[in-house]
Amino acid sequence: KVEGDRLICGAGVRLKRVSETARKAGLSGLEFFEGIPGCVGGALRMNAGAMKSWAFEPLIHLTTMDRQGLIHKWNAEDVEARYRQCPLLKEHIALEAVFEGTPEDPKQIKQAMDDYSQRRRQSQPIASSAGCMFKNPTEISAGKLIEELGLKGAHVGDAMISEVHANFI
């Protein structure tokens, strides 16, 4: 649901739908979700990211449920989010997220989304995959490290390290 410059999403909403809804509403800042498979809840749990943007960057409010079934409302700045993790969401389950966008011409947003898609097609495998598998160490990306080890194209049975991007299997 769009309210002004905010997009209110249930945890089960697909990320592609989030980016498309934001685009149609003229809200920039959520374009990077377009190519990430999965839903809002999972993206927040792992602080999913792409194109140098992260799930917690446009987030302003989060509603969760704890193990006792109690509902909690959080301001995003009160929730710790790190590279590929959100410690709170190990103990709580995300129910709803409120993202804030920046007003922008939907055509400009569409162009940014198209640019992201093009970059993905050039740098990531197009065929079905399990996605990016490993967290990046601090000094070098996991894909670069795997590539430098000469493992691009290596396989066990039908599982193969992508020849396009070594962090994809």
Language-model features: where?
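Generic structural motif
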Residues: 1-2, 59-62, 159-161
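Anion-binding (especially nucleotide phosphate/pyrophosphate-binding) glycine-rich loop
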Residues: 1-40
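Acidic/polar active-site rim loop that often engages polyanionic ligands
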Residues: 2-4, 44, 92-96
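Short, conserved aromatic-histidine micro-motifs
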Residues: 4-6, 10, 14-16, 60-77
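Gly/Ser/Thr-rich helix-start
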Residues: 13, 36-43, 50, 132, ...
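Short, well-ordered, mixed-charge alpha-helical segments that flank or form enzyme active sites
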Residues: 16-19, 39-47, 52-54, 71-74, ...
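A gly/ser-rich beta-alpha-beta helix-loop segment of oxidoreductase catalytic cores
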Residues: 25-60, 66
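Phosphate/pyrophosphate- and phosphate-bearing ligand-binding catalytic cores of soluble enzymes
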Residues: 65-169
